[in-house]
């Protein structure tokens, strides 16, 4: 069967280092994990060069939204808030990440596959850099507001509503090789393909929270499955 096009995409930005980067920025991984991600790009490009496979590569910022695995920052915060558990924040919480709603990311990938010249690389970013501590506080505030105004959602709480506040935040030691900022420049996909993220972060985070509130059965099923690993 003929291969129409290979699209390789990932969410790890440590490939470049810690400055604002474009698609032409030299790859500069800082950890074994990010080196493995960089290697995947290099393999795709090597196959394209050697065997003339049609390909595109996308590199995106941190995704969030429905079906995000519960161990990741935003769903972990949501899960812990509902249970009244502490919210671990690395370092002082001042690490900065760019956040991209998953639906916007999917539309960007589709646009690359459908319209981009073969062999081109595109950064897909959310134009939404935030400190981790601000993400945590916004999530606390949003859940508290929903629970106060829509009482039917309180059935998913295993703690008192009064416990949903900033006292849940606890600062933990930052992990080795953790970059202070992942700064992505998605100008190329905006100017060449006309893509732009449609979801403001405050809208996206509320949609995400509501999805998790409405899909606790999925969350529990995933957590139960991972506990048997």
Per-region residue spans from a language model:
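A short, structure-level motif marking secondary-structure boundaries and short turns
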Residues: 28-30, 62-63, 170-172, 215
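C-terminal substrate-binding subdomain of Rossmann-fold SDR/epimerase-dehydratase oxidoreductases
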Residues: 75, 81-229
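Catalytic helix-loop patch of NAD(P)-dependent Rossmann-fold dehydrogenases
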Residues: 1-57, 64, 68-70
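Active-site proximal helix/loop that lines the substrate pocket
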Residues: 15, 62-68, 94, 114, ...
